[in-house]
Amino acid sequence: MKKTKGSIMLLFAAFFWGTTFVAQTTASDQIGTFTFNGSRSIVGAAFLALLILARTGMKKQKAKVSGEPVEKESIKRTVIGGILCGCVLFFATNLQQSGIAAYPEGVASSGRSGFLTATYVVMVAIVSGLLGKKLHKIVYVAVFVCLGGMYMLCMSGGIDNLYFGDLLGLLCAVCFTGHILTVDHFNDCDSVKISCIQFITNGVLSLICMAIFEQPAWSDLAAAWFPILYAGIFSSGIAYTLQIAGQKYADPA
């Protein structure tokens, strides 16, 4: 039952991530990579902070009515986990957005980037196997299917059909593999809090890079308000939190 619950959470997370690729592609034509990821991360962190405040208020009210004390939790491990997850996510999301922006006009950047990013599913299974975890036979089939799909997507037209964005997409998948495994290591922490902290970390790092490399005009940010808001709330705020919560019940591989 718990595994089914985790799978449903991860399914909804995948849905929100998939729909966000369109927003990411739109934003790549309007603002820089670090600007977009910094902005969406801050929006996501703010959304989750409000959720944490609301949930804390409800817990206190419930404790007041029942007369039971509010359960205290150690925040140290959650903060450490959130910062580590945020650092890995910084590389993953910015490589992903850079890859989308790197594709030439006319190339289906959303589809290519989405598929290449999703190869982290196979990478996680492979890494888990290397770490001594017994893998189901279907994983080996998935590896060959994935490799075949990558060839058809990137190499069916020869070397000329291979783009720099494809390489960035694969590097992004490697980073997302690291993120999945890091989340799994801290799966005993509060899902919403660790997600909020990871996006504060990702947001701060991305905004520092934005100030150094991009320095966008306010008009550019205003033009990209919808992709930023959509990605910030639905992808960063909701989907990644569902991922962290779902991994408590489902095997990362």
Language-model segments: which ranges?
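Helix-helix packing/entry segments at the starts of transmembrane helices
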Residues: 14, 39, 113-119, 182-203, ...
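Hydrophobic transmembrane alpha-helices of multi-pass small-molecule transport proteins
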Residues: 48, 135-155, 172-174, 206
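Cytoplasmic-side transmembrane-helix entry/capping segments in multi-pass membrane proteins
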Residues: 10, 77-84, 135-147, 165-169, ...
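Transmembrane alpha-helices of multi-pass small-molecule transport proteins
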Residues: 30-91, 121-127, 175-179, 196-214, ...
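Glycine-/small-residue-enriched transmembrane alpha-helix faces in small-molecule transporters
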Residues: 1-39, 87, 91, 95, ...
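Specific transmembrane alpha-helical segments of multi-pass solute transporters/efflux pumps
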Residues: 20, 56-116, 150-152, 232-250
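Specific alpha-helical transmembrane segments that line the substrate/conduction pathway
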Residues: 35-46, 93-133, 172, 252-253
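Membrane-interface helix termini and inter-helical loops of multi-pass transporters
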Residues: 22-33, 98-106, 151-164, 210-228
